[in-house]
């Protein structure tokens, strides 16, 4: 399938004149349209700053002490070029010979800006002399003097007392707001009265559904240039209420990736102006939910201003507040404090602040359906706030799509953030580190070898935009993906609602099975992303509840629709590979379903064997551990059915310790039985004979199972040149294994009625002013007025995150009462799951009345031992087989990767 052709990718010639057709500053703004009809029929809008309007031109602000102006004809006499002002495109470089390079004009002097190390946050009026007093020049003979003059204290903010008049375009409120001089003085930009993407922030008050964004005549800056910019990479950072450090961590990683692509001067796609092909979109889920410190960081970057947003436009509720700005600032984090400094590369930013909390799936609707439809990007990258991509990881993801035309989606390696290993001291973090590592070494390579990865993590993944599109009938991957937004209410079936807790799994399946297409999914080992993992048991349980329920029901959906793969255009061999993978997933899911019973049976068989070896002590331990096992498991069920993890943390921690002791006892039993078997074989046969030793079925199954898992994990980790987790996290993972089975699984199944994401939308945001159009088509708005106000507001935002963030203790809100239908379904699932595992236990142990079918006690014991031996052999050999299958898949992935790298060695540079 050929990819849709977007606009030309070639960078602008540096001699082009560029101006924005949407110049709409948020100081006193009037529209000077030729006629109402001209405005109504135009695709562009244009407004004029009052100091430059209607023949009253004067300039209130010049960052240079000398006051020298831009020498273009327009700047000398704007009224003489009235028509040109309305028709000229957005021009980031108004003067061809200006020193700003390809992205703007740099003033000849900035106050204190030569000192790169100067802190952003200083005392009163730290940004330099009063720009409204041109006569105050301490060095009239030297316009380039570096020493700043003493300055008066800024006047109080007057921004709420000024009313501006603006013209709405097609009923949409769109404003261009001047950037605070405090920020503007630190970056290259056009000189007044010229303006560019660095001097103004663009605000749009969206009053529509994301799907209607384009139809309602909303647009984005990239489409307003004389030569619209092609978006090769569209990156979205989704967030809820993450603090400033988490957001800054992600944003820093993204900026470094853009700098890396800007540095690839020999690339056919990237290079000096690579930043023009990349748009970074930040979507925040709810105006009342966003962390004020994070919002202040966005303001420091220039992409947000307080006092601009509106509640309603002509009686229509605003659904999202959209801010656009090309920032030249970057972030750094030192000792937990976020700092802002001048960056090396401009970054096109789009900040979408949703009015209501509508969950992450709705944030993705704004990204794909609203903004994606306007920009028509090639590759879309999804990142969660808090995940930090490696310095070239975004490029590596893009490269996977560039090398494989039929790659519809790709993901990288998600790593647990360890802070130089310090967090490994927490056993819960170490356990998750091991889990992530083995998944990236065994599971993802195996699935990538088949071409179908069951889930591309939403925390760090990428998709080809054209592959996501629906067909003419409106059916396709995005249609299935966004169906989940409507599944979180009473109108949804509980099965479907749980399934859409993992809608990214549904999206992956719909991509590879898309009708008449042959898209595949790939794992990119060289692309990495670090993320924070839960550090407390309550957090961990809540997170895994959603993961386990969503993945289980989504896997059932994929397997039930596995034959949909035949509607695709894949080759017969590829379809056969998919079917083999589906069989593997079915077996894995069956083991997951019976994990509770399997673990208890292994525990009972091994401890029963151990009591014969230890005598009386073994029998006492066997009885004590068996009763405690059952008691703790019942306690876990009761807590899961009626208590929140946050309110039962001590109970859960006690159970974690108990299951750790149980696992340690099991490992001791395995080693002890193995050693005793070897000693017995040597004693009986007068020497060591491996063939005779393997005739002992319990010993043989134990050895094969251990070798096929633990030893294989070490071998494959060494082959992948990443073995350190085996030494730092392996023991913790072993001890936590029963917790995964007996706590996480039980809590997940006991809470299938809870289809929330752990967030509530009951907080009400502060009321904003509304905008209503008058008879002449104009509207009055309240907004900041002059440079002093803008600077004071900017300083206020900087001080919000000037100190280290301290976590506040969250007061839990009253839980909403769940519907009886959901609770009934939950009870049915739990009962069915419990009875399945109880039936398996009774069958293997010949208990629950099955022992009465044999009258002879010796024969009954023999029959029980035989059933236990057969069961243990089936389970452990199955584990060995699945492990071998994963190993082969991982090796095949590695071989293909090495061969591909060899073949590309002499290919052109990307």
UniProtKB/Swiss-Prot annotation:
Residues spanning the membrane: 366-386, 448-468, 583-603, 620-640, 655-675, 701-721, 730-750, 828-848, 876-896
Enzyme class: transferase
Known EC number: 2.4.1.16
Keyword Nucleus belongs to the record: no
Biased composition (Basic and acidic residues): 57-84, 130-148
Any one biological process term the GO annotation gives: chitin biosynthetic process
SUPFAM superfamilies noted in UniProt: Nucleotide-diphospho-sugar transferases (SSF53448)
Annotated GO MF terms: chitin synthase activity
Gene Ontology cellular-component annotations: cell septum; plasma membrane
Alphabetic keyword roster: Cell membrane, Cell wall biogenesis/degradation, Glycosyltransferase, Membrane, Transferase, Transmembrane, Transmembrane helix
Any single Pfam family the record assigns to this protein: Chitin_synth_1
Known catalytic reactions: [(1->4)-N-acetyl-beta-D-glucosaminyl](n) + UDP-N-acetyl-alpha-D-glucosamine = [(1->4)-N-acetyl-beta-D-glucosaminyl](n+1) + UDP + H(+)
Coiled-coil annotated spans: none
Localization terms from the record: Cell membrane
Membrane topology, record value: Multi-pass membrane protein
Family per record: Belongs to the chitin synthase family. Class I subfamily.
Role played: Polymerizes chitin, a structural polymer of the cell wall and septum, by transferring the sugar moiety of UDP-GlcNAc to the non-reducing end of the growing chitin polymer.
Annotated protein name in UniProt: Chitin synthase A
Annotated organism of origin: Ampelomyces quisqualis
Lineage, highest ranks first: Eukaryota, Fungi, Dikarya, Ascomycota, Pezizomycotina
């Amino acid at each position: 399938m050929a990819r849709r052709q977007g606009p030309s990718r070639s960078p602008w010639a540096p001699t082009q004149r560029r101006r924005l057709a949407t110049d709409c500053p948020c100081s006193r703004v009037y529209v000077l349209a030729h006629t109402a009809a001209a405005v109504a029929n135009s695709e562009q809008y244009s407004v004029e700053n009052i100091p430059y309007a209607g023949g009253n031109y004067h300039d209130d602000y010049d960052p240079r002490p000398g006051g020298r102006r831009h020498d273009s004809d327009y700047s000398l006499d704007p009224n003489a070029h009235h028509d040109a002002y309305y028709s000229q495109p957005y021009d980031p470089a108004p003067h061809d010979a200006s020193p700003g390079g390809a992205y703007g004009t740099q003033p000849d002097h900035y106050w204190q800006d030569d000192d790169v190390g100067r802190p952003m946050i200083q005392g009163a009026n730290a940004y330099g002399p009063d720009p409204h007093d041109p006569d105050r020049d301490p060095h009239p003979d030297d316009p380039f003097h570096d020493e700043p003059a003493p300055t008066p204290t800024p006047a109080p903010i007057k921004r709420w007392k000024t009313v501006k008049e603006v013209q709405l375009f097609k009923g949409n409120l769109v404003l261009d707001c001047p950037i605070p001089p405090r920020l503007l003085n630190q970056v290259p930009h056009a000189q007044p009265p010229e303006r560019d993407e660095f001097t103004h922030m663009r605000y749009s008050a969206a009053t529509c559904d994301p799907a209607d964004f384009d139809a309602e005549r909303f647009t984005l800056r990239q489409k307003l240039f004389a030569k619209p910019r092609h978006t090769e990479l569209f990156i979205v950072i989704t967030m809820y209420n993450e603090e400033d450090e988490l957001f800054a961590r992600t944003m820093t990683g993204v900026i470094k990736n853009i700098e890396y692509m800007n540095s690839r001067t020999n690339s056919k796609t990237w290079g000096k102006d690579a930043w023009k092909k990349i748009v970074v979109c930040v979507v925040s889920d709810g105006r009342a939910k966003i962390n004020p410190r994070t919002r202040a960081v966005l303001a420091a970057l220039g992409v947000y201003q307080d006092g601009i947003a509106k509640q309603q436009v002509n009686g229509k509720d605003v659904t999202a507040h959209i801010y656009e700005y090309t920032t030249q600032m970057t972030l750094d984090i030192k000792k937990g404090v976020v700092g802002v400094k001048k960056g090396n590369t401009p970054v096109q930013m789009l900040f979408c602040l949703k009015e209501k909390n509508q969950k992450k799936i709705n944030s993705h609707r704004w990204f794909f359906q609203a903004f994606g439809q306007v920009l028509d990007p090639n590759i879309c990258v999804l990142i969660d706030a808090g995940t930090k991509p490696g310095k070239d990881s975004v490029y590596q993801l893009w490269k996977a799509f560039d090398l494989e035309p039929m790659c519809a989606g790709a993901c990288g390696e998600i790593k647990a953030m360890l802070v130089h290993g310090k967090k490994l001291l927490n056993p819960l973090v170490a356990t998750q580190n091991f889990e992530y590592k083995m998944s990236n070494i065994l599971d993802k390579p195996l699935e990538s070898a088949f071409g179908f990865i069951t889930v591309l993590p939403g925390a760090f993944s990428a998709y080809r935009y054209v592959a996501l599109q629906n067909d003419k009938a409106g059916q396709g991957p995005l249609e299935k993906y966004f169906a989940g937004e409507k599944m979180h209410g009473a109108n949804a079936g509980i099965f479907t609602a749980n399934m859409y807790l993992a809608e990214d799994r549904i999206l992956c399946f719909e991509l590879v099975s898309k009708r008449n297409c042959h898209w595949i999914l790939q794992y990119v080992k060289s692309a990495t992303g670090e993320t924070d993992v839960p550090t407390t048991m309550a957090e961990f349980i809540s997170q895994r509840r959603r993961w386990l329920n969503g993945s289980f029901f989504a896997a059932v959906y994929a397997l039930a629709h596995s034959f949909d793969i035949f509607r695709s255009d894949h080759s017969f061999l590829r379809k056969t590979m998919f079917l083999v993978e589906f069989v593997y997933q079915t077996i894995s899911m069956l083991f997951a379903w019976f994990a509770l019973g399997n673990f208890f049976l292994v525990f009972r068989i091994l401890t029963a064997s151990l009591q014969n070896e230890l005598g009386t002590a073994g029998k006492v331990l066997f009885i004590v551990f068996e009763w405690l096992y059952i008691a703790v498991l019942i306690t876990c069920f009761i807590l899961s059915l009626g208590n929140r993890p946050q309110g039962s943390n001590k109970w859960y921690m006690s159970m974690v310790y108990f299951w750790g002791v149980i696992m340690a006892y099991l490992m001791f039993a395995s080693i002890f039985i193995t050693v005793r078997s070897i000693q017995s074989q040597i004693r009986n046969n007068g020497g060591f004979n491996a063939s005779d030793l393997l005739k002992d079925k319990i010993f043989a199954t134990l050895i094969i199972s251990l070798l096929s898992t633990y030893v294989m994990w070490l071998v494959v980790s060494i082959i992948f040149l990443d073995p350190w987790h085996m030494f730092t996290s392996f023991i913790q993972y072993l001890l936590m294994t029963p917790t995964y089975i007996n706590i996480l699984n039980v809590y997940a199944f006991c809470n299938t009625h809870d289809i929330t994401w752990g967030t509530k939308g009951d907080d009400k945001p502060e009321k904003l002013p509304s905008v209503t159009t008058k008879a002449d088509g104009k509207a009055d708005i309240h907004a900041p007025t002059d440079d002093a106000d803008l600077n004071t507001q900017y300083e206020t935002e900087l001080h919000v995150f000037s100190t280290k963030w301290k976590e506040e203790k969250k007061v839990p809100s009253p839980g909403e009462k769940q519907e009886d239908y959901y609770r009934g379904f939950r009870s049915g699932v739990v009962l069915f799951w419990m009875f399945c595992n109880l039936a398996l236990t009774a069958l293997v142990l010949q208990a629950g009345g099955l022992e009465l079918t044999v009258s002879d006690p010796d024969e009954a014991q023999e029959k029980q031992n035989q059933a236990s031996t057969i069961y243990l052999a089936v389970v452990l050999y199955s584990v060995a087989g699945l492990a071998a299958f994963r190993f082969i898949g991982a090796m095949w992935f590695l071989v293909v990767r090495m061969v591909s790298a060899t073949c590309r060695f002499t290919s052109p540079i990307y």
